[in-house]
Every structure is written in structure tokens, then in C-alpha cells.
Amino acid sequence: MEGGFTGGDEYQKHFLPRDYLNTYYSFQSGPSPEAEMLKFNLECLHKTFGPGGLQGDTLIDIGSGPTIYQVLAACESFKDITLSDFTDRNREELAKWLKKEPGAYDWTPALKFACELEGNSGRWQEKAEKLRATVKRVLKCDANLSNPLTPVVLPPADCVLTLLAMECACCSLDAYRAALRNLASLLKPGGHLVTTVTLQLSSYMVGEREFSCVALEKEEVEQAVLDAGFDIEQLLYSPQSYSASTAPNRGVCFLVARKKPGS
């Protein structure tokens, strides 16, 4: 993109949650690359957090944006979930849904699909209430800080989740590598990092605005995770991509890694 890296000030001023949600999470118009990407993530998360999968007391989601789909599986296996985002508007959008305020975004299609994966599509309303009860706080975050939740200090968590966020928050591969080390600092030794990264994406559209990303290769993501003190337990590549007019990525990788006990 011509304007260079999109920093925090631009996100705070110009990132409009409803434009983002309507572009990437609107399923009224039938099948789309965006809907398929959501299904890919929900399927991966179900396998990761479902029966026999990761569980624990505390999970921190870094860079939640205005979305809740990413913790629909985890709310069944963790007791205390923290959502976080850099911008005020995104945190306000999350609060609207959590508090069931008028005009909150309708996540019913995602809730129903998540429940289908669990074998009980009829309990989607129960799932929504379970998630609302499990999310204990919504905090400001900045993955580029040594403590991404500054000024709040939370006890080390069992799991850190970050989907489709780090590549947007970081201005370079070096910054991405540093951000992963920052995320590692939020975890207990032996805790897990769960992440989805869009590959080879240099920018994406939200409404009429273009936001920059660091274009990452699968091998760069893998090496950055290893160098941040993790052992990789699962690395799944998919050619799944968004619509070329909104987010022209080339594939995506889903990764589960365990923080080394001594790190």
C-alpha cells in the first residue's frame, strides 16, 4: 500500500468495527471466501479445544477485534477468558454483545456452526450465555509492548489465543518476532499459544480504508514461534484465502505451540 505502515493512531481513528464485521463476518449473502475462512477457523478451534483437547483455567485472547467467534470453542474448556483489543471502538463493540445491548452484532450463524461441530446445533443460545459468563474482562492491548496488556498485569495464563491479528499489528518480520516473545511472556511455562496467521498479505480493506500488514511466509511464522521459546505441536497450512478485492492473502496457517518449561 502507498501510505506505509498503518499504526495504532490510524486504527483508533479510522478502523470502524461495523465495516469490518460486514465485510468479513456477514453471512446473509450465501457462500463466500470469508464464510469459508470463518468455518476453517471454527473447525480448527473445535479440534484444538474440544473433547480431549487443550483445557485449563485461564485464556487470554490478544487482538480480539470486534469478534467473539474465536472463543466459542474455548469457553467450554477454560473457566476465565480475557478478550483484548487496541481500539476503543472494538472493545465497545465487544461490550455491546457481552451485555446484550440493543444493536449488538448478530453472531447467530457462527454460534450455530460452532454448536453443529459439537454435535448439538440446538444449544446455540446456551452457548452464547456460557461465553458471556466465561469472559471476565475486556482489556486494551498492544502486542508490541513487552507486557501487551499494559498497564494491567494478569497472572501467567494457561493459553494465549491470537487469530488474524499479529500480522496486522506488526510493521515488519522483526516486529512480529518480538511480538511473539511478548505473547510468550503472558503464558505459564508449559502453556499453549494458538494462532491463525494469514500468509503473504500486505494489506486489507475495511470499508473504504486500507490497512497494512506484514506479509509472512509459513516458514517465517514457524521459525518465529520456535525462536520465541515454543515447541510446535501442530502446524496446519490451508490454501484458504479471502476475496482478492478485500484481503488478497495466499493461504493461511493454524498453529498450536507449547511454551518450553524452562522459558
Curated annotation (Swiss-Prot):
Reaction catalyzed: a tertiary amine + S-adenosyl-L-methionine = a methylated tertiary amine + S-adenosyl-L-homocysteine + H(+); a secondary amine + S-adenosyl-L-methionine = a methylated secondary amine + S-adenosyl-L-homocysteine + H(+); a primary amine + S-adenosyl-L-methionine = a methylated primary amine + S-adenosyl-L-homocysteine + H(+); dimethyl sulfide + S-adenosyl-L-methionine = trimethylsulfonium + S-adenosyl-L-homocysteine
Return the GO cellular component terms, semicolon-separated. cytosol
Enzyme Commission no: 2.1.1.49, 2.1.1.96
**Where is it localised?**
Cytoplasm
Modification sites for N6-succinyllysine: 13, 96
Q: Which InterPro entries match?
A: NNMT/PNMT/TEMT_CS, NNMT_TEMT_trans, SAM-dep_methyltransferase, SAM-dependent_MTases_sf
Q: What class of enzyme is it?
A: transferase
Q: Which UniProt keywords apply?
A: Cytoplasm, Detoxification, Methyltransferase, S-adenosyl-L-methionine, Transferase
One GO MF term, please?
A: thioether S-methyltransferase activity
Q: Which family is it part of?
A: Belongs to the class I-like SAM-binding methyltransferase superfamily. NNMT/PNMT/TEMT family.
Q: How does it assemble?
A: Monomer.
Q: Which PANTHER family match?
A: INDOLETHYLAMINE N-METHYLTRANSFERASE (PTHR10867:SF33), NNMT/PNMT/TEMT FAMILY MEMBER (PTHR10867)
- The protein in question is named Indolethylamine N-methyltransferase
> Taxonomy-wise, where does this protein's organism fall, top ranks first?
Eukaryota, Metazoa, Chordata, Craniata, Vertebrata
